[in-house]
Amino acid sequence: MLFDVDGTLFLTHDEVYVEAAGSAMEEVYGTYADGPDVPGDTATAHVRRALQAAGFEDAEIAAGLRDWCNSFSDRYVRLLAESDTSHWQLAPHAAEAVGAVERRALLTGNPPPVAHARMERLGLGALFPPGQGAFGCERESRIELFELARERAGDWPAETTVAVGDTPLDISSAHDAGCRCVGVATGTYSEADLSHADAVIADLGGLAAALTALTP
């Protein structure tokens, strides 16, 4: 099972993320640009859209993406270590729901160090050891992240791979990758917005029942 992070496990707007991503963009590209937000997309896809809107050519963007990912990740981990995150909100029933799944990993648009640092701070670090899942900066397309995550799980079959996410893009990407998806309405989208998922739950407390219903 592949868990999204923002809006699925983690419900707080992360100012550390915003600061680290923006300052890394200024370092690598010499400017700060913001573009249209597509909830559920990868960090690199968002940066590409923002820089395109600012007039950057695709080749120029591509040449700096790896440096941006590294700078962003380093800055985030450093800033987080100095930050008070007592206001951070873990999704309801997240620890219990994740812990009840035997084969689990993260599939998120966050770069790996960012995702793992967040999980550690939220108390979920031990449930998501490094070396599994797939992350932003490893692939720009969320669809391609599914293939990478399955490869890391020993070529786990797509037809028995289930994702958990809170956005329409989480769901459509899973389906385009040949996987199923449980939509969870703990982010900005309602259960009706997520109705094209294979199952929809109000929060992660309903995950076990949803998985039972999806099992032939």
Where are these regions (language model features)?
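Asp-based, Mg2+/Mn2+-dependent phosphohydrolase catalytic module
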Residues: 59, 95, 99, 116-216
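Short, surface-exposed acidic
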Residues: 29-38, 55-68, 126-130, 157-158
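Anionic, Ser/Thr-rich low-complexity intrinsically disordered regions
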Residues: 68, 107-109, 134, 138
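Short, acidic loop-to-helix structural element flanking the phosphoryl-transfer center
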Residues: 2, 78-106
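Helix-loop "lid/cap" segments that line or gate small-molecule binding pockets
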Residues: 22, 45-60, 149-152
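An amphipathic alpha-helix signature
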Residues: 18-22, 43-48, 69-73, 112, ...
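Short, basic/glycine-rich phosphate-binding loops at helix/coil junctions
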Residues: 71-80, 126-128
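Active-site neighborhood of HAD-like aspartate-dependent phosphohydrolases
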Residues: 1-39, 45-48
